[in-house]
Amino acid sequence: MALFSGDLDLAEQLFQAAFEQAASQEQKAESLYGIGRTHFARRDYAKSADTFNRLLGQFPQSAVLANTYFMLGENYFRLGEFTQSANAYRNYAETSPAIIKDIAFTLQGDAALNAADYNQAITAYQSAMQANPETNTAYLNLQIGKAYDALENYTTAIQYYLSVYDATSDDLTKATANLLAGQAYKKMGLNEEAYARFLDSVIQFPRAFDSFTGLSILVADGVPVNEFQRGLVNYYAGSYDFAIRAFERYLDSNPEDNDGSAYYFKGLSHYFRGEYGSAISDYEQLIFGYPLNTYWAAAWDEKAHVLWVNLNRPTEAIETYLGFVMQSPTAAEAPAYLFEAGRVAERAGRLEEAALIWQRMMDDYPSAELSYRGLFLAGISYYRLNRYEDALSVFQRSLVLGTSPREKAKAYIWIGKCHQASGSAEEAEQAWQAASQADPTNYYSIRANELLEGLEPFTFDTRYDFGYSLELERPEAEAWLRSTFNIPQDFNLGELGELAENPRVKRMRAFWEVSRYRQATNEADLLRAELQTDIANSYRLLNLLLDLQLYQPAVYTARNIINLAGMDDLSSLTAPIFFTHVRFGAYFRELLVPIANDYSISPLLFYALVRQESMFNPYIASSAGASGLAQIMPATAKENVDLLRWPPNYDTADLQLGRVNLTIGAFYLNRMLTYFSGNMQAALAAYNAGPGNAEAWLALSGDDPDLFLEVIRFQETQNYLMQITEFLNIYILVYQR
């Protein structure tokens, strides 16, 4: 368990102690295997490989033999010993009964290809397809094509490339197949065939970088290319100067016979070069000359954005958005552009103008999704102007129009705030009482209770007791499952049963055993989706996931069971405590609790943060690049590692180690808490969106924490603060003593 959580020093100590105390040869082998995996997690690949080779020499009959070969393959590949890596993966495939042989064969092929052993690579990739027909055949066939290419068997290589082109529906893969086929044709001296492949990509897949590579070859060889398509490919590749030149040539040669799209992409290209005046000029060419163009509405938005964000001309930006709405009041974009006009006015400090624009949304577009939010923000604008009667009127309208308990609670909060600001304490209390009852597990109801008690956000008794046993809680959970879902008494919920033979269970375990945790989690997610309506086997899966410490899919599985029982957020807390402890677990407590305490962060709050950030998955990575349990961005991590002067020899990959990630996260949150003078709300906002943004929002809101939340510019950060509050509320309910 210490290995999975990233507490590598402890893991090595435990494995070493187990090795020394082992009563059998098999136990010694398993302990040595754990030591090797620990070195691998440290990225000490040479030491890891030595450990696994020692295991092979001392315990050649061990049950972990096959997995040892796999781990050797992983280490040798990272050490650049590709021939040894390929051999190790092949040995795994030959000795393992595991269901992930397709992965081993694929990795063998990759290693052999890097070792220039092309025939072995071809055989390995073909074996991968035979082992699992559902595997990624596009990747495998492209790799086989590359191997034949390297063997100078270009005809066969092209056959593989074009088979991928014909079979896949993915544009990027098609562009890759075209590029490889075209390059092979060129090697054969068949230039016309090569150019046909490159041109096909330029015309059909302009977003693909491989299309840009093909375009570069066409241009270098003097092959004529449609200038608009040439500009488009350059634009998507980030080659904005060449894109502009191509669009200009296209427009010069087609002054009348073009649909205006070139102006849009030329404008974008100027924008990314920082040439804002030229960008606006191009957008206006499209706006005034081509009202039927696909990008016509987008051009208005781009123009307004440049005026507002880049040129600091908010009046013209507002006029642009309002001009669009005036010209095209029935356009799908009209409500959003009206909302943006209000947003620009608000950012410019013109709060009354913003309020009037936002109020107009509900009048003109009552069914638009953004209109209710616009109405609410109108109330916030009046409140910031100290026009409490106007704000109260808007919030009362929001209350009437609100369709969800959350919207009702939110409106009541601000009705109460208006009464409080006007000196009507009794009416304020009545509104907050109503808010507290509207949606008890929701942020605004939680905040209403704090207001009734005169508390700031994140003010709570920090005492806790994380002592619980899921094992002791299972009997109650299973009895509840049987009575709620009519599961027969003779159905054994405590064992996997037939689920043990499920291919996804086997793959999940196999991936876990060779430290491929992301792939194990992916298999778990696929399986829980397949079992979504199978309560009994979902529960069996849940217990397996807990055993493997795959907490993220375990939480989702438990939530699905609760949903199928017809329970909402509030009533779910009346289910057996087992399910609440799974969904809001004190996971990794040996790491998280002392680390949180070391940096003066309540473990209850830190658990809420980690649950929000990663759902307790140490190996998760966001699309933005954040990684690990506390979702740290690489640049933020490096800054804090430099301040901590720990860990030694830090690498971004260390963010997947729980001890490293949690330490950096707690240290950074503590820094932000100190920077913002103990204001946890601002510190959390800074953790999510950066201290500069948090400072700006504090300046707008003064000392009002409720206003702080509403003036946050990023919906993600607003949701972040609300979710952490909601999760913290449950952690307090469950663990506070």
Residue ranges of predicted features:
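Catalytic glycan-binding domains that act on GlcNAc-containing polysaccharides
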Residues: 334, 348-353, 357-358, 385-386, ...
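Residue-level recognition of tetratricopeptide repeat
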Residues: 1, 37, 74, 110, ...
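Residue-level detector of the short coil/turn that links helix A to helix B
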Residues: 6, 43, 80, 116, ...
